[in-house]
Swiss-Prot record:
This is HTH-type transcriptional activator AmpR. It comes from Providencia stuartii. Keywords: Activator, Cytoplasm, DNA-binding, Transcription, Transcription regulation. Belongs to the LysR transcriptional regulatory family. It is found in: Cytoplasm. One of its GO terms (molecular function) is DNA-binding transcription factor activity. The gene is ampR. The lineage of its organism: Bacteria, Pseudomonadati, Pseudomonadota, Gammaproteobacteria, Enterobacterales. InterPro entries: LysR_subst-bd, Tscrpt_reg_HTH_LysR, WH-like_DNA-bd_sf, WH_DNA-bd_sf. One of its GO terms (biological process) is DNA-templated transcription. Pfam families: HTH_1, LysR_substrate. Residues 26-45 bind DNA.
Amino acid sequence: MSGNYRHRLPLNALRAFEASARHLSFTRAGLELNVTQAAVSQQVRLLEEQLGLELFIRLPRGLALTDEGLALLPVLSRSFDQIESLLQQFEDGHYHEVLSVSVVGTFAVGWLLPRLPAFAALYPYIDLRIMTHNNVVNLAAEGVDFAIRFGEGLWPLAENTALFSAAHTVLCSEKVANKLTHPLDLKDHSLMRSYRKDEWEKWQIAAELEPWRVKGPIFDSSRLMVEAALLTDGVALAPSCMFEHELSAGTLVQPFDISVTLGGYWLSRLKSRPTTPAMAIFRHWLLAEVQK
């Protein structure tokens, strides 16, 4: 067998060999392929003749692979698995595509998750996989298609598209809010902090206060910070747009109409990553949702 023979590949014989090699039995291969044992044996023999070598050692009971058979089996098995996996992605007349998105946890719970049912209804053939992070994500190492994160959009080697800015304001329970009549009253309460060191100072300046040193636990998630504030009668400085449900329900209260913008939410992808159809669809859908 020589030259360009792709158009002459003995696919039936290759299938017969691959099944027989996995089972080390022509009989069990025939059951899998829904043909007779004799038909499988004949196909394997034809393949051996075409290759000019033996792929099996015929034993009194069963089969054993020759060195050539051992070399051929993993290549065929991998190829058939890939073909099967790809064909499964064409179910329902659509190409089913996996889309992986790494999302900062606060954005995932406060904004994205409530909207995902609508996305799934529009694009059932996109297998969306959501992974949460706390703003530290390596697009190259994690192999995700997109990351949604908070900051100023200055991440290198990435195409960063602004979604919306996020004004941070004081959030707490109604019990704590009843004790806050002036921003200076915050000095008497535990103030939760994030990894952004100057956020409380910026809010104090916006409130026309002389900044004071804030001491309190540090969190890497605004969602976790707010939960901690509710559990410990503390006060959080967090993006109110991510807690609209809790504010509407009265679980959270915004005691002061003072806010400060510390950054925004961004959609990021590696510049070197080719855009797939699913990526283009998700980006278009996400930006449309942001505009609503």
